[in-house]
Curated annotation (Swiss-Prot):
Subcellular location: Cytoplasm
Post-translational modification: Methylated by PrmC. Methylation increases the termination efficiency of RF1.
UniProt GO molecular function: translation release factor activity, codon specific
Superkingdom of the organism of origin: Bacteria
GO cellular component: cytoplasm
Name by which UniProt lists this protein: Peptide chain release factor 1
Similarity field: Belongs to the prokaryotic/mitochondrial release factor family.
Alphabetic keyword roster: Cytoplasm, Methylation, Protein biosynthesis
Coiled coil feature spans: none
Positions of modified residues (N5-methylglutamine): Q235
InterPro entries the record matches: PCRF, Pep_chain_release_fac_I, Pep_chain_release_fac_I_sf, Prokaryotic/Mito_RF, RF-1
Function field: Peptide chain release factor 1 directs the termination of translation in response to the peptide chain termination codons UAG and UAA.
Length: 360
């Protein structure tokens, strides 16, 4: 193990001892906010320190086994113990590398999922509907709640644009790699010649902010318009102006919300989406400034980038970022996304490990 890594782990070990002392202090237990902060830190570093102490014990065991090598009667046993100990060290070191990876502070958050039809006209809108169904089914499998915030339905079905809130622990960690361009290749139902058409949609996954107040939005920088909500082709027309459109002048971001039961609820939802988009824009700008040349393609979340192709005639889905092709398009589009999501997460983790190795 690299000296820099050992030094970092030793510091964490000392910190855990300090936290244990603090947690037994009445001054800490009587201060609820401080107590929660300390218990959270304690929970975060305990598994790391436990692995490090197991690593140190394995080193001791290897030294004791090597000391027995000089004894002819114990030599074979000592060799076996030494090899087993070295394998254990390797396994623990790999586990420690993963535990030390920087955690995304947004991983546990709820998300706003935005899907917009792109090139391809009606077929693109239908594909947007298929994507929303896929994510909704996946969310159901996870036990998450899906709530449509705003939907602009197409007259042939599907959506020109749909925004949904997905509530569930770890929603962002699972779906954050879905941001980008999604392309579909299939024969439309209206195609009489059997020709394959290509259409596209863009997906954006935004972590929900804790409070709208966490993002600075100057009231003078926004315009709020109200209008009558309607479904596809003017269906379900409300008699009151309950739909809300918010325009944020500094960023040019426009948010519409019309699926709530009242103007008040629509405005609250629209402000939440606006805050999430502004926050995401700020994070994108910060990352752009500090991005290194080997910035992870998976983690970039560039919405203009084509990330995946859904080829229906061949029954395949290809994720271009990791060159993964799966011939199970029906299962995946019905929400069986685990293999795809886990592969993306594993690649991202490998990329972070490579970065950690360079930093060390």
């Amino acid at each position: 193990m690299k000296p820099s890594m050992i030094k970092k782990l030793a510091t964490l070990s000392e910190r855990l001892d300090e936290l244990n002392r603090l947690l037994s202090s009445e001054d800490v237990t009587n201060d609820i906010d401080n107590y929660r902060k300390i218990t959270r830190e304690h929970a975060e570093i305990t598994p790391i320190v436990e692995q490090f102490r197991a690593y140190e014990q394995a080193e001791i065991d290897i030294k004791e086994a090597q000391a027995m090598l000089a004894d002819p009667e114990m030599k074979e046993f000592a060799q076996e113990e030494t090899e087993a100990g070295k394998q254990k060290l390797d396994d623990i070191e790999k586990q420690l590398q993963k535990l030390l990876l920087p955690k995304d502070p947004n991983d546990e958050r709820n998300i706003f999922l935005e899907i917009r039809a792109g090139t391809g006209g009606d077929e693109s809108a239908l594909f947007a509907g298929d994507l929303f169904r896929m994510y909704s089914r996946y969310a159901e499998r996870q036990g998450w709640k899906v709530e449509i915030v705003s939907a602009n339905e197409s007259e042939v079905g599907g959506y020109k644009e749909i925004i949904a809130k997905i509530e569930g622990f770890g929603a962002y960690s699972k779906l954050k790699f879905e941001s980008g361009g999604h392309r579909v290749q299939r024969v439309p139902e209206t195609e009489t010649q059997g020709r394959i058409h290509t259409s596209a949609c863009t997906v954006a996954v935004l972590p929900e902010v804790d409070e709208v107040s966490d993002v600075t939005i100057n009231p003078a920088d926004i315009r709020i318009d109200t209008f009558r909500a309607s479904g596809a082709g003017g269906q379900h027309i409300n008699k009151t102006d309950s739909a809300v459109r918010i325009t944020h002048f500094p960023t040019g971001i426009v948010v519409e919300c019309q699926d709530g039961r009242s103007q008040h609820s629509n405005k609250a939802q629209a402000m939440q989406v606006l805050a999430a988009r502004i926050k995401a824009k700020q994070v994108d700008e910060q990352q752009s400034k500090i991005a290194s040349e080997r910035r992870s393609l998976i983690g970039s979340g560039d919405r203009s980038e084509r990330i995946r192709t859904y080829n229906y005639p061949q029954g395949r889905i290809t994720d271009h970022r990791i060159n993964l092709t799966l011939y199970k398009i029906d299962a995946i589009t019905e929400g069986d996304m685990d293999e795809l999501i886990n592969a993306l997460a594993a690649e991202h983790q490998a990329d972070l490990l490579a970065t950690l190795g360079e930093d060390n």
